Design a protein with these regions (language model features):
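Short beta-strand-centered aromatic/proline hotspots
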Residues: 27-36, 126-133
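N-terminal beta-strand/beta-hairpin edge segment
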Residues: 33-51
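Short, conserved beta-turn/loop elements at beta-strand boundaries and strand-helix junctions
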Residues: 37-42, 68-72, 134-139, 167-170
Length: 181
């Protein structure tokens, strides 16, 4: 979908859970509460088990469909729960970036831990850690594994291959809290 198409869909869905489909990348859809659509990215709160679990910045061109509760009865029920559980008060993302370049510049400054998804022709790779530098179109990351061990070498990520960045989620935030940086 284009940025304009996405803006049109989310325009009247203020603070509602929507189902976002990335047909080329994922068989599974995501439940998200969109915050804004920028030039290249959709920024949204991530919904998991009736709770907000961080934020996602998704490259718009990979979004193939956005489904609202008008087309999906289950989403209507989820939005009812979302409202009754008072989840609408979850703070907006502090990053208001419409491109991955701008987002990564902010992440270098903040030192926040993130999960970066890169979409290659034959595979999808995930890198979890902190963005430590941005030079041209290459971001440098200090990554860690599921055992909390830092990678010996830093990882270089080409922004052209980044399809999504997740931050503020419980897994990444909790792991990063206990890593010996």
């Amino acid at each position: 979908m284009t940025a304009k198409e996405i803006q049109k869909v989310i325009k009247n869905q203020n603070n509602k859970i929507l189902e976002v489909v990335r047909g080329e990348i994922d068989e599974m859809s995501m439940l998200l509460v969109p915050q804004f659509q920028g030039a290249e990215l959709l920024c949204a709160k991530s919904v998991s088990d009736f709770a907000i679990d961080g934020y996602r910045f998704i490259r718009s061109k990979f979004i193939s469909e956005i489904i609202s509760d008008e087309k999906n009865e289950t989403l209507s029920f989820y939005n009812h729960i979302y409202e009754k559980e008072n989840l609408k008060n979850f703070p907006d993302c502090k990053y208001n970036c419409d491109t991955f370049r701008k987002l990564f510049e902010e992440l270098v400054k903040s030192g926040d831990a993130v999960t970066v998804e890169c979409n290659f022709e034959e595979a999808i790779d995930y890198y979890v850690g902190k963005i430590t530098d941005l030079t041209g179109n290459l971001a440098t990351m200090q990554c860690f594994d599921g055992s909390g061990i830092l990678f010996k070498d830093k990882v270089r990520v080409n922004l052209d291959f980044v399809s999504m960045v997740s931050l503020g989620d419980r897994y990444t935030s909790t792991m990063a809290k206990y890593i010996k940086w």
